[in-house]
C-alpha cells in the first residue's frame, strides 16, 4: 500500500491521557505483568469488543478452557494496539493463536489506512510470535441505520480479507452473523447501543470464533480438520 509509512493508523502510538487518571497505561502494565506466569493457548487483543467479551458467561464457557488472555482496552484503535504489542504485551508468553479485533474506533482514518494498521499488527505478531497463527475478526456493522462508518467498516473487511491472503498463518473471520436486518437496521437486542454487543449478540460471534480456533489448534496438532468457509 503506497504511503503506508506515513499512515497514522500503522504508527505505534500510546493513547493520550486526556482524563488524567492513567487508566490506559495502568491496564497495559497489568497485561504485561499478568502474562508473566501464564501459558495461554490463545491471546485476544483489541478494543472494547474484546474487553467486554471477558465479562460474558460465554467467555468462561468457550475461551477459559483454552487458558485465553484478554488484552482488550475500550477505545483502542490500530495504532494503540501496535504500541502495546511493541511494549511487552506478548513478551513473556508463546500463544498458539493471537486474535485481533480492532479498527472500528479509527474514526478519522480511511478504509485503506485502517487496513494498513491491521496489516501492521499482523506483521508485528508474526515477528514477535512466529509460531502463532493470527486470527483477524472482521469489523461489525454499526449504527441503527445505514451510515458512512458502517460502509467504511465493510470496505475495511474486504481490503483486510484480500491483504491477509499473502500471510499463510493469518486468517480472516467474518464476525457478523447477520446483525443487519432486511430493512437496513440493527436491533438493540444484538447491539445495545448500536456499537457494542449485548450478551445475545456475543453468542453467535463467539461460537463461530471458537469453532475456528479449535480447527486451527487441531490442524497444528496434525488432525487436519478443514477450515470453515467464513475463514480464509
From Swiss-Prot:
Subcellular location: Cytoplasm
Active site: 48, 193, 196
Entry-linked InterPro entries: SGNH_hydro, SGNH_hydro_sf
UniProt note: phenotype after gene disruption: Knockout mice which are homozygous for the PAFAH1B2 gene appear developmentally normal, and are born at the expected Mendelian rate. Mice have normal fertility and normal spermatogenesis. Double mutant female mice which are homozygous for PAFAH1B2 and PAFAH1B3 are grossly normal and fertile, whereas double-mutant males are infertile. Double mutan mice manifest an earlier disturbance of spermatogenesis with an onset at preleptotene or leptotene stages of meiosis.
Phosphoserine: modified positions: 2
Gene Ontology biological process terms, A to Z: lipid catabolic process; spermatogenesis
UniProt key word Hydrolase: yes
Function text: Alpha1 catalytic subunit of the cytosolic type I platelet-activating factor (PAF) acetylhydrolase (PAF-AH (I)) heterotetrameric enzyme that catalyzes the hydrolyze of the acetyl group at the sn-2 position of PAF and its analogs and modulates the action of PAF. The activity and substrate specificity of PAF-AH (I) are affected by its subunit composition.
PANTHER family: PLATELET-ACTIVATING FACTOR ACETYLHYDROLASE (PTHR11852), PLATELET-ACTIVATING FACTOR ACETYLHYDROLASE IB SUBUNIT ALPHA1 (PTHR11852:SF2)
Protein name, as recorded: Platelet-activating factor acetylhydrolase IB subunit alpha1
Species annotation: Mus musculus (Mouse)
Species classification: Eukaryota, Metazoa, Chordata, Craniata, Vertebrata
Name of the encoding gene: Pafah1b3
